[in-house]
Design a protein with these regions (language model features):
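Post-HEXXH active-site segment of zinc metalloproteases
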Residues: 59, 81-114, 133-142
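Active-site recognition of the HExxH zinc-binding catalytic motif
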Residues: 70-83
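Short pre-active-site segment immediately N-terminal to the catalytic Zn-binding motif
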Residues: 55-71, 106
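An active-site-proximal "capping" alpha-helix that borders the catalytic cofactor pocket
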Residues: 110-126
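Auxiliary, metal-adjacent structural segments of Zn-dependent hydrolase domains
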Residues: 1-56, 106-111
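Pan-zinc metallopeptidase signature
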Residues: 135, 139-197
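Short helix/loop segments within enzyme catalytic domains
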Residues: 122-137
């Protein structure tokens, strides 16, 4: 099945297993990896990212912004972190503070974002795509992001040591197999893709 679906992508001008990172590739890979077992689809083109819980027989949908590759990886990371109960709620039942957060709100944001961004870093490393932490506060960017960068970087290394299972790891392996042609993960990939502010 995988070869057939990647062939379909190739007919539309998107080459699988190349340095080109397309959301169409991610959608196909996500479907192959998770659609059947978790009844979840990856959907691009949203003005804002959003998770729509399964309802009335419809699958759950992970909506990512526009056609942004990193947005797709980031939203998949949130999905991988969310437990069974959270995945039954729209946007996982979280309240989101928009741009313009004050310093205290930004610190709270960073606390809850370390884990998903650590997974996102591993996803980027697995497919050879540049990674930079997202402060997600364009109106009031903090002057120093180094503590947050360090926390994300260290959490990613911890995940490599302690969590070789679950949806996050399954996705890392799928990406590495597709983009790097190996099911293994090389720790140096993290340093290769990590970009400091």
């Amino acid at each position: 099945m995988r070869a057939a679906t990647l062939t379909q992508i190739d007919r539309h001008g998107q080459q699988g297993n190349t340095e080109n990172h397309t959301v169409q590739q991610l959608e196909v890979l996500f479907d192959e990896c998770f659609a059947k077992q978790f009844n979840t689809q990856l959907v691009g083109g949203a003005a804002e990212p959003y998770y729509c819980a399964p309802h009335e027989g419809n699958p759950a949908e992970i909506h990512f912004s526009h056609d942004y590759f990193r947005s797709a990886l980031h939203e998949i990371a949130h999905w991988c972190v969310a437990g069974d109960e959270r995945r039954q709620r729209n946007d996982y039942g979280y309240w989101y503070a928009p741009d313009g957060r004050n310093a205290e709100q930004q610190r709270e944001f960073e606390k809850v974002e370390v884990m998903p961004q650590a997974w996102e870093l591993l996803f980027c490393a697995a497919c050879g795509h540049p990674f930079r932490v997202s402060m997600d506060n364009l109106d009031n960017s903090p002057s120093d992001v180094s503590d947050f960068e360090k926390a994300v970087f260290e959490q990613a290394k911890t995940l490599l040591r302690t969590v070789p299972r679950g949806r996050g790891w399954q996705w890392v392996q799928m990406l590495a197999l597709h983009y790097r042609r190996t099911a293994g993960f090389q720790r140096e990939w993290i340093e290769q893709v990590f970009t400091a502010w």
